[in-house]
Amino acid sequence: VLSELPRTALAVRHFQGREVRCPVPADGELLLRVLYIPLDAASRAWMQGATYRPGLVAGEVMAGLGLAEVVESRSASFQPGDLVCAETGWQTFAVVPAAGLIRLPRLEPLTHLLSVYGVAGLTAYFGLLECARPVQGETLAVSAAAGAVGSIVGQIARIRGCRTVGIAGGASKCAWLVRELGFDAALDYKTGTLADDLRRTCQIGR
């Protein structure tokens, strides 16, 4: 559980493990065994108050998505062994409504269901292709390019024929963007010359 709302940096004291009786699903519900949870930056924002969801409350299970396996089903739409992504919170077992959930394929590795095919991947895909709508040949600068969303944005942009310039903190992250992910260039914002570097690399004003 989230035992205390943090006012500064997160620490072990803000969380507490508890053992409780395993919940029992009612009609239309599923008992899930949580396999993986993502540690997203959004989780920290929820601790600071209401965002796109209500703020968290101390003493309750830490909120969050979970990739889970159905243990017991009280819904005709799911069977034990099915995989789903649901609002499970940070716990080993959770009971959730079956309505609105979809059965997921068993990919390898399973963690891709929470990353590339999860919220980060969907945010990158629709944010880039439906909102930004870059055109082939354009230069696209990606902030937080070494993060979950930014790293996927850059790769999709490259596939769509854009020149991609990533912005990240530190030489190692910048090297990873270029060598491993195929970014055309990467800028280290920690150098203190980001504005000049961005103008030069993206040829702004030419």
Language-model features and meaning:
Residues 2-8, 37-39:
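Short polar catalytic/cofactor-binding loops
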Residues 62-69, 80-144:
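NAD(P)H dinucleotide-binding glycine-rich loop of Rossmann-like/cofactor-binding domains
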Residues 201-206:
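A glycine-rich helix->loop->beta "capping" turn
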Residues 10-12, 43-47, 148:
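Short, glycine/acidic-enriched capping/hinge loops at junctions between secondary-structure elements
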Residues 9-21, 50:
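Short glycine/threonine/proline-enriched tight-turn/helix- or strand-capping micro-motif at secondary-structure
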Residues 1, 70, 81-84, 164-168:
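Short, hydrophobic beta-strand segments that form beta-sheet elements in well-ordered domains
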Residues 21-39, 47-90:
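Glycine-rich beta-strand-centered segment in the early N-terminal region that forms part
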Residues 118-197:
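Mid-domain Rossmann-like dinucleotide-binding core that forms the NAD(H)/NADP(H) cofactor-binding site
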